[in-house]
């Protein structure tokens, strides 16, 4: 018996001798990996602020490795060159990108509590307010500004305006905003929302175009955008009418399956105009996350959580696209976007502007193949990564975290022309916030 006990003790010591190094090794690997991911996110942050945030606090679409880019002149903006939508110009997506990126900026400040990070979030907020102050058209949200800090393209869009609402709401409730800033933001939100409602939930545009895009409809994106706008306005103003509109809207039915908007939210993101479009749908998922955060009804909150989980699972399918990116790629990006003016012609309607833009883009990608690669293998999987991290279900998030981390560490940000890797930082801040 005594011998048996001795043998057991020896085995225990041997197991410990082997197990302890294994545990220590696993711990070291995990920590090294965490450091690698954190460093990649910090590099993305540094590169974004070095090259892509303009003097007015607005994120531009692209720049060279020194942060230089030729902006559209005021005359080109007025004439709609290369097109009145500003598609493939360097000031195409300022409202969209600023509004989305605010999520990362606020989460970064909450993590660091650094005054410098609060000021960065404030600068983005000021850029968003500027984009709502550059036109005589009430409720207009611009895409970006020209060299004079005011001139702009005549049309924004629903893709620009929802992130504008989302970003300002996120800043308003962050803890950074002063009382004066909160009041100013509320004024802009109310004025813009009221005008959109007056136009039947269409986005205001300048003459001769009238409007561009809508929050009305029964696609997930439209449903989430409209509900979020109502709920956010109620949160910011306390006005009962917005909550009443919100509750009525939830019950409305329509679409191919005659689902209620509540049910559509529960189903989550759906791709419908191409195989994947995480980069345009992510704002609607961000809006759903905002609805989940603001909702006090337990049953409704649970349904929003299901929608976020479904969205995360769908988005995760695009994460492997990041591995198709080649950091050594040297294909032409073509900084001179004005080559598109070869196809330019005057536009007087939204349809004419979009048709022109599509012709221009098709030709442009032939001389600028790098642009297509960055959008396919950087923009799409990084936006998907952020969508995954918006899910409040820890089990779902844990299952996809390794793949999200692979996306974050995939790129050499100093060699990218497009700013559309900013979702990398957004995803990491949410992972860090969860941990």
Protein language model regions, located:
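Cysteine-centered motifs
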Residues: 3-6
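N-terminal export leaders
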Residues: 16-20
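Hydrophobic helical h-region of N-terminal Sec-dependent signal peptides
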Residues: 23-28
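Low-complexity, Ser/Thr/Pro/Gly-enriched N-terminal "stalk/linker" regions
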Residues: 34-96, 122-123, 127-144, 180-187, ...
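Terminal, non-catalytic domain-edge segments
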Residues: 35-51, 177-178, 278, 284-435
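Carbohydrate-binding/catalytic loop surfaces
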Residues: 58-89, 137-157, 205-225, 263-290, ...
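Non-membrane alpha-helical segments in proteins
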Residues: 90-110, 123, 146, 150, ...
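Elongated scaffolding segments in large macromolecular assemblies
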Residues: 179-328
């Amino acid at each position: 018996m005594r011998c048996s006990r001795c043998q057991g003790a020896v085995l225990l010591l041997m197991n410990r001798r082997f197990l302890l190094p294994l545990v220590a090794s696993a711990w070291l690997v995990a920590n090294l990996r965490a450091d690698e991911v954190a460093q990649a996110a910090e590099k993305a942050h540094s590169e974004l602020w070095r090259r892509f945030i303009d003097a007015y606090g607005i994120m531009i679409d692209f720049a060279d490795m020194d942060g230089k880019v030729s902006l559209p002149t005021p005359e080109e903006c007025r004439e709609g060159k290369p097109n009145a939508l500003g598609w493939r110009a360097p000031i195409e997506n300022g409202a969209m990108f600023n509004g989305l990126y605010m999520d990362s900026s606020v989460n970064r400040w909450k993590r660091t509590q650094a005054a410098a990070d609060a000021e960065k979030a404030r600068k983005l907020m000021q850029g968003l307010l500027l984009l709502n102050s550059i036109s005589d058209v009430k409720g207009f949200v611009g895409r970006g500004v020209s060299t004079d800090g005011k001139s702009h393209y005549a049309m924004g869009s629903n893709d620009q305006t929802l992130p504008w609402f989302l970003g300002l709401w996120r800043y308003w409730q962050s803890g950074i905003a002063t009382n004066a800033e909160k009041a100013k933001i509320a004024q802009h939100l109310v004025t813009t929302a009221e005008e959109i409602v007056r136009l039947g939930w269409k986005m205001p545009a300048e003459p001769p175009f009238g409007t561009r895009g809508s929050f009305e409809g029964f696609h997930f994106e439209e449903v989430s955008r409209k509900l979020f706008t109502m709920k956010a306005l109620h949160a910011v103003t306390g006005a009962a009418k917005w909550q009443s509109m919100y509750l009525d809207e939830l019950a409305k039915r329509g679409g191919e399956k005659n689902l209620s908007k509540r049910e559509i939210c529960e189903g989550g993101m759906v791709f419908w105009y191409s195989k994947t479009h995480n980069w345009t749908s992510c704002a609607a998922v961000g809006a759903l996350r905002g609805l989940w955060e603001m909702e006090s009804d337990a049953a409704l909150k649970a349904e929003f959580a299901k929608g976020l989980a479904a969205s995360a699972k769908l988005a995760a399918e695009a994460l492997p696209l990041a591995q198709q990116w080649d950091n050594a790629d040297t294909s032409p990006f073509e900084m001179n976007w004005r080559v598109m003016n070869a196809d330019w012609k005057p536009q007087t309607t939204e349809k004419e502007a979009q048709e022109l833009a599509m012709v221009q883009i098709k030709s442009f990608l032939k001389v600028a193949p790098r642009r297509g690669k960055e959008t396919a293998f950087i923009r799409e999987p990084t936006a998907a990564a952020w969508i995954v991290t918006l899910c409040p279900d820890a089990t779902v998030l844990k299952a996809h975290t390794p793949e999200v981390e692979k996306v974050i560490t995939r790129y050499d940000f100093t060699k990218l022309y497009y700013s559309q890797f900013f979702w990398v930082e957004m995803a990491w801040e949410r992972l860090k916030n969860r941990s």
